[in-house]
């Protein structure tokens, strides 16, 4: 690919959206309290959008999603926006989503959860292998495919308003939740997934990483 600036970007007004903190358009896909453990602490659902952020706020979720952005397209168009720039939206355990878990799919917490099985973690449980609701939400292909389809619809609607969409791609690093690594052992027993490099020395992804004693 070339590195020249496309004509449509020259002089365009870009509006950057941190999706979790923009608007909650679909409460059925909200991250729940203790849905999983992230950096040694449970995920937390925040209802008060006017509270001060915590010092370690990456596991706190306000419920913003793509439906919330979709609901505000006329507002964005009215501001004179030409391009909507979305912070990462692929499957990830953090609210910033710079530690992508699955590069192939939009996070169902931002898209669509059509199959919602399992349970949140009890107070005494800190092992993500037992985070059955989270595992169902982010590994069930029905949720993942529905979320990708919704994103296609989202982009089509943005285009109808005369605006464009660009994504924040994060391709040079991932996190322990990533399905190629699977240090959290989320994918280990799920149908349709290869073993992660952390789980199995014979994993097809083993050569993606370097391991040291």
Name each model feature, range by range.
Residues 19-82, 89-213:
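Substrate-binding/active-site clefts of carbohydrate-active enzymes
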Residues 12-19:
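Mature N-terminal segment immediately following signal peptide/propeptide cleavage
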Residues 8, 12, 79:
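Structured loop/turn residues at beta-strand edges in well-structured enzyme cores
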Residues 1-8:
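Extended acidic/polar, glycine-enriched regions
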């Amino acid at each position: 690919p070339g590195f020249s600036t496309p004509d449509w970007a020259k002089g365009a007004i870009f509006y950057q959206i941190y999706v979790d903190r923009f608007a909650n358009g679909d409460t059925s896909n909200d991250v729940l309290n203790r849905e999983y453990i992230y950096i040694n602490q449970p995920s937390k659902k925040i209802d008060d959008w006017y509270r001060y952020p915590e010092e370690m706020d990456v596991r706190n979720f306000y419920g913003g999603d793509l439906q919330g952005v979709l609901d505000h397209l006329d507002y964005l168009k009215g501001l004179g926006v030409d391009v909507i720039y979305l912070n990462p939206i692929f499957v990830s355990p953090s609210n910033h989503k710079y530690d992508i878990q699955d590069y192939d799919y939009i996070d169902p917490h931002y898209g669509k959860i059509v199959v919602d099985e399992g349970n949140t973690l009890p107070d005494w449980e800190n092992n993500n292998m037992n985070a059955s609701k989270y595992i169902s939400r982010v590994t069930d292909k029905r949720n993942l495919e529905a979320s990708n389809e919704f994103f296609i619809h989202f982009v089509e609607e943005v285009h109808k308003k005369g605006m464009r969409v660009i994504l924040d791609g994060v391709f040079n690093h991932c996190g322990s939740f990533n399905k190629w690594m699977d240090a959290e052992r989320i994918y280990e027993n799920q149908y349709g997934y290869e073993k992660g490099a952390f789980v199995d020395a014979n994993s097809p992804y083993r050569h993606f990483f370097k391991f040291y004693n």
